[in-house]
Amino acid sequence: MKNFSMLVSHVLVPPAIEAIMRSPGNRVQAFLAAGHVCSVMGTWQYPPVAARFRVPIVVTGFEPLDLLEGIRRAVVQLETGRHEVENAYPRVVSELGNEAAQGVIAEVFEPVDRAWRGIGVIPARGWRLAAA
């Protein structure tokens, strides 16, 4: 095939949240987890992160009402001293995610060190195309 290339820049989000929370001068008080990522990967990886760093994580979609609901839920958690994972996007996201898609990801990609702009390199937390 001529004149064909692919830019693969897939990453795992929970390790990035951990890196942000460990960074000096961090002032992040809550996270909105991207619904499109969680629709594939699920929410099951987030509770240990929320507990370890005592930070609310709310899964949300990208529609204005979805975002506002995610922000509202994060604020309620902050006001009540909670630090849990909430799924504000249940019409798309489940705890386990899309297991068929996860199987394809495991088949097609392999873990790689990935640089995140503003964070640095996170070891073995990105994906690249696996050798054929």
Residue ranges and their predicted role:
Residues M1-S5:
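A short alpha->loop->secondary-structure connector
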Residues L7-S9, N26-E95:
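A conserved active-site cap/scaffold subdomain adjacent to cofactor or substrate pockets
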Residues E69-A132:
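Internal helical hairpin/lid segments
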Residues A16, R27, Q45-P48, A100, ...:
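Exposed alpha-helical structural elements
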Residues L7, V11-P14, E18-R22:
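Active-site loop-to-helix "anion-binding N-cap" substructures in soluble metabolic enzymes
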